[in-house]
Amino acid sequence: MVCLECIFYLSGILIKRFPCFSIRNSGVFILKEKNLPQFFEEYLKKGSVFKEKRVLQANHFPNDIPHRAVQIHQVRVVVAPALRLERPSNLFIYGKTGTGKTLVVKWVINGELVSAAKKAGVSIQTLYVNCKLDADTEYGLFTELATQVGKELPLTGLSTDDVCSAFFSKADSTKSILIIILDEIDYLMKKAGDDFLYKITRKNEELKNTQVAIIGISNDLMFAEHLDPRVKSSLSEEKLLFPPYNAIELQDILNNRASSAFKHSSLEPGVVEKCAAYAAREHGDARRALDLLRVAGELTDRKGATSVAVADVDSAEEKIDHDTVAELVTTQPRQAQLVLYSILNISHGAGKFIFTGEVYELYKKYCAKASLRPLTQRRVSDILSEFDMLGIITARVISKGRYGRTREIMLAPQAATPVVRRLLEEALNL
Ligand SMILES: Nc1ncnc2c1ncn2[C@@H]1O[C@H](COP(=O)(O)OP(=O)(O)OP(=O)(O)O)[C@@H](O)[C@H]1O
Ligand SMILES: [Mg+2]
């Protein structure tokens, strides 16, 4: 432990030896302005192509949502009965990543509906849970929901059913409509099964004051197909698909945001079009398009140039892919890295389906080389499912007639690169 006196003693020495430092009451050192390092001085003097960069960041809420009028209307239609204290139908929303699902749901429900309810004096509670980030177990989900309705829970000693009951009894304490938005619901279901959905729908029938509606959002298009039939019929009372954006639609989205994000004339002609075309080429992902534009701007600033050029979009694409894959690969546990390395060595590039059995055999050989105990085929199969969810591979189940079913996998292009190989070899010491 460092005592406060020591800190002040050391601060004194530091200030005497380095007079460019001063000390605030809080004890935090700050540099006196005139002694800023050259680098930062120059950085501050340099201009930037951005006027307001955060407009391009993923969590920024835009003030307009082009090309989603149909979906916005459909969500409004489904949730409107809540304003008359009638339970809205459960809604299941699906579409690929970056197609505006989260944005539209938050816009209509947390924004428009909540304001309309306030105005009308109707009690509507809305709870939003991102199952991937905040609750990837059943226990985690009910704890999160209970916390959001203001129920204090002891830190230990409660079972999942206890937490579930505690949440519902608190939620049922006022006459209201409760809308639970379960974003990235497929993550929770893949980890915890669909029992939580069954619990919610069954509990709903027992409540006296509150009526619950669920809005599930998923980018796994086949997600609803895997549900228990009872849960499936209840969750899919209404379904809504968000199609991918095309290049022209992405241009509109980007232009809308670019006008407040960038300084006048700091985007050369063709930049927005190229970002839109690149993002449309993959799967019409608005997040990707916005990232490309933002990173192209950041790279321009780093170079000290005054306008973003078309070529900067290529550099941005390279940087984003490199950063994403590098993070994915290097943060995987060692066993998963070995599985990926085996896939890489069998695949010889992307675009070819390979059998999971072959992967397992090679993986076992690498384990022996690395003096690691191999996981069971079952566990390796779980790792492959995880890779599938992360977009590192694409998996498909094929029937082999009377020999049962087997799974084939294909490495995604962004994982079939020399960079990934090098990162894995470095991480695994191979
Ligand atoms: N029509 C639009 N207008 C303006 N911005 C949009 C539009 N559609 C999407 N975006 C922006 O693109 C990004 C991704 O959108 P969003 O998070 O809603 O996608 P999603 O479908 O929920 O993706 P995921 O399945 O990966 O969660 C966000 O920054 C969002 O603001
Ligand atoms: Mg989302």
What residue spans do the PLM features occupy?
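A short, basic N-terminal segment
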Residues: 6, 18, 23-87
